[in-house]
Design a protein with these regions (language model features):
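NAD(P)H-binding glycine-rich loop region in Rossmannoid oxidoreductase-like domains
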Residues: 10-55, 59-63
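Conserved Rossmann-fold NAD(P)-dependent oxidoreductase catalytic core, especially the SDR/UDP-sugar
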Residues: 54-100
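Catalytic helix-loop patch of NAD(P)-dependent Rossmann-fold dehydrogenases
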Residues: 81-131
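NAD(P)-dependent short-chain dehydrogenase/reductase
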Residues: 116-161, 165
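Mid/C-terminal beta-alpha module of Rossmann-like enzyme folds, strongest
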Residues: 159, 169-230, 265-267, 273-276
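Conserved C-terminal active-site "lid" loop/helix of NAD(P)H-dependent oxidoreductases
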Residues: 165, 194-196, 223-255
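Amphipathic terminal alpha-helices
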Residues: 249-250, 254-276
Length: 276
């Protein structure tokens, strides 16, 4: 797909490129790179990717970038029994400690906040999107969450939010236009329950197990390669972590896809979806 008129696309490696030269004269920088993926495990995973973020922040500071937009995740709120439904941006950042993806995003937010604090003229927008999908491309996080929710626990019923990538792009544009300073949840209106997700995903029973057994089955399936969902994601399939989009909507943003539409667009049935 050719770029829009006036748009120049340059493919660079942020780990080695001269970022000061690339960012010179930029008014705003939007950093949407994924970093650690939802299926990553291991305590040393992601250090090199955070080093890349450090390079980007240093270069942005050196050349005088005034506005930075970074993509975090709604998962930084963590999935906890006492979470309000929905969560607003005023909720504390407390990711589930065993899920590296969420912990990494929280660390990214800390680094970006330190950059913003270095100069009162700097603005920082932190986008906290729900599970994001594209047409026929569920993405790594959607695949992980989908696999994890196929094993249902008696401890709770998961609530889901699914964001179309086009709506995430519109949110980034909105944040730049408003030069917004602070966190912004990015999600469709409302949320859907596990029964709706099962109906939209097609026929096929799911596993429903006691909490401890569900977690054990999830660990075994991940270890033998039958599931992309690491054990640390399990709390996100039990406790609520859906978010409110009110603050972003106040800036003029509106989702063009519902949860249901985004879920169907990005859903790929997995092994457990077809389990007899």
């Amino acid at each position: 797909v050719p770029p829009a008129q006036g748009v120049e696309i340059r493919v660079v490696d942020l780990a080695v490129a001269d970022l000061r030269d690339l960012l010179a004269d930029a008014d705003a920088v939007v950093h949407l790179a994924s970093g650690v993926t939802a299926g990553d495990v291991g305590e040393n995973t992601g250090h090199d990717r955070l080093a890349v973020v450090e390079r980007l922040l240093a270069a942005a500071g050196d050349v005088g970038v005034g506005h930075l937009v970074v993509r975090s995740s709604a998962m930084v709120y963590g999935a906890w029994p006492d979470n309000p439904v929905p969560l607003t941006e005023d909720a504390p950042v407390r990711p589930c400690p065993d899920f590296l993806f969420a912990v990494h995003r929280a660390r990214l937010e800390e680094m970006a906040a330190s950059w913003a604090a270095g100069d009162p003229a700097r603005a920082l927008t932190v986008l906290r999107p729900a599970v994001t999908v594209a047409e026929e491309r569920p993405g790594g996080l959607a695949s992980v969450v989908g696999a994890a929710t196929s094993i249902r626990s008696h401890e709770g019923e998961p609530l889901g939010q699914f964001l179309h990538s086009d709506d995430l792009a519109d949110a980034a544009v909105c944040a730049v236009a408003a030069r917004y300073h602070g966190p912004l949840n990015v999600a469709p209106d409302g949320w859907i329950g596990v029964d709706v997700m099962a109906e939209l995903g097609g026929p096929g029973p799911r596993l429903r197990l006691p909490g401890s057994l569900a977690a054990l089955v999830g660990r075994v399936l991940f270890r033998v390669g039958l599931s992309p969902a690491p054990p640390g994601v399990f709390p996100y399939t039990v406790h609520p972590w859906v978010v409110s989009n009110d603050r972003l909507c106040e800036l003029g943003w509106r989702p063009s896809h519902s949860n249901e539409e985004a879920y169907v667009a990005g859903h790929e049935p997995g092994v457990l979806d077809r389990l007899d």
